[in-house]
Amino acid sequence: MVVAMDQRTNVNGDPGAGDRKKEERFDPSAQPPFKIGDIRAAIPKHCWVKSPLRSMSYVVRDIIAVAALAIAAVYVDSWFLWPLYWAAQGTLFWAIFVLGHDCGHGSFSDIPLLNSVVGHILHSFILVPYHGWRISHRTHHQNHGHVENDESWVPLPERVYKKLPHSTRMLRYTVPLPMLAYPLYLCYRSPGKEGSHFNPYSSLFAPSERKLIATSTTCWSIMFVSLIALSFVFGPLAVLKVYGVPYIIFVMWLDAVTYLHHHGHDEKLPWYRGKEWSYLRGGLTTIDRDYGIFNNIHHDIGTHVIHHLFPQIPHYHLVDATKAAKHVLGRYYREPKTSGAIPIHLVESLVASIKKDHYVSDTGDIVFYETDPDLYVYASDKSKIN
């Protein structure tokens, strides 16, 4: 096993202190003493049951809420209230995304046609190519925690990081710019990777999936053209107020939540390569989060560890499944910090992580994020130092 990690020894004069420290210290990169089958066996049977009616009830709930908010905002049309509308509607757009995400996993129902139709409607409405994103997200789940093969917010190897222009590094690691990256990711993927979620011939997809990608790109295009048509009818400002700004809020939710589920824990968590990676070890690097009042609105997306290991579990069973699995996971499960009504504490975790988690070593089968000490030292400051 090759580990790229600082090793610190305790030298305080107490001959027994080192042993006690070793016993107390938990190594999150150590092989877990359980198998994924042990976790599966601990999850109650009802957690695996998918109800199309229950899933559709959440769709109806969210669509009614989105429509009601839009109608109310247009009717009142007050610049004092528009910011409240943007925040609320953008949050609901994110909730709609989560339901479409469930369709992509097949946790929405056991009916593939229903999953595909509902998924296309929901994701196209918020300008997400359903099959394109579904397939790349499947790759993310199948390779979670793998430095090279993971797909979402994958860490950059040092050699790739060092080749990026300083301006690109600043864009990637200066808040809030990374929280606006999703549309670019759909078009170009992440640094070090190539392909588009819209192109049927992208390296993201197998030849057998090209028709699916073409279908989703067509649905996306219909929505995009519809927005342009609406801007001619009602004016660009009206479309921007009703749809455009909430879309930006949705993108920020998506990027922030996705990032926080794989970064920003108080202790450094491992990323794997080669023989050290396994589906279980990669999944155990994910992090649960408490989003306060948004937990229910966002369909319990914060219960992320069990979701990553068993994406076929419906979102409305994830809380029960997580509670049941904790005794098996032990210290490999990191209890999320309890949130107030608004999860302000997560902003601190997000900013701190972006400022220090920049790249991983080019070598080693178990690696941890490292910090570029010169990233925020601008050219003028560097010249003074030199």
Swiss-Prot record:
Signal peptide: none
Protein name per Swiss-Prot or TrEMBL: Acyl-lipid omega-3 desaturase (cytochrome b5), endoplasmic reticulum
UniProt keyword Endoplasmic reticulum, yes or no: yes
Motif (Histidine box-1): 101-105
Domain remark in the UniProt entry: The histidine box domains may contain the active site and/or be involved in metal ion binding.
Tissue: Abundant in leaves and seedlings. Barely detectable in root tissue.
Pathways per UniProt: Lipid metabolism; polyunsaturated fatty acid biosynthesis
Region (Disordered): 1-30
Motif Histidine box-2 in this chain: 137-141
Enzyme superclass (EC): oxidoreductase
PANTHER family listed in its UniProt record: OMEGA-6 FATTY ACID DESATURASE, CHLOROPLASTIC
Molecular function in Gene Ontology: acyl-lipid omega-3 desaturase (cytochrome b5) activity; omega-3 fatty acid desaturase activity
Role description: Microsomal (ER) omega-3 fatty acid desaturase introduces the third double bond in the biosynthesis of 18:3 fatty acids, important constituents of plant membranes. It is thought to use cytochrome b5 as an electron donor and to act on fatty acids esterified to phosphatidylcholine and, possibly, other phospholipids.
Biased composition (Basic and acidic residues): 17-27
Gene label: FAD3
This protein's UniProt keywords: Endoplasmic reticulum, Fatty acid biosynthesis, Fatty acid metabolism, Lipid biosynthesis, Lipid metabolism, Membrane, Oxidoreductase, Transmembrane, Transmembrane helix
Motif Histidine box-3 boundaries: 304-308
Family: Belongs to the fatty acid desaturase type 1 family.
Organism: Arabidopsis thaliana
Biological processes, Gene Ontology terms: unsaturated fatty acid biosynthetic process
